[in-house]
């Protein structure tokens, strides 16, 4: 059985195939959390709790509220840390199903069933100098597969460290174009 992939695992593989093999396949080296990854995980958790459970954002992260609240102002069902998985035939499947081919987690997903539009966002605490829009395309395609009634997906990398709108990498995909790609 081939392991399922994700955008982040693909980026790791593209960065250094040997390192990927040593770390992910052979599991020779355990993951070493850095200050940056620890901070990013703490911010993600605080935002997830704020969205899912209405837990107040800790004081050290309140500067991120304008970006988070801008997303929450969109109409529709709000889903935090929404797990999506597809088979090799691009059909939705369970996260841990034996037939899973690709996985992705939407940090925030807003599905508007009335206007058939969705917003998918990924919180970023790092540098916004080289945004990776390929992640947005993958997430948009996964949303289309999981929500077949949706006609348009707006996707964004949300750089919470930079609260001006120009620091949002944005991508929109309509159902017709998505069907051509799948």
Question: How would you label these PLM feature ranges?
Answer:
Residues 2-56, 81-82:
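Nuclease catalytic cores
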Residues 5, 38, 42, 131-134, ...:
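Generic recognition of stable, solvent-exposed alpha-helical segments in well-folded globular domains
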Residues 33, 126-129, 172-175:
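Active-site oxyanion-binding pockets that recognize sulfate/phosphate
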Residues 33, 37, 115, 140, ...:
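Conserved catalytic core of nucleotide polymerization and phosphodiester-bond processing enzymes
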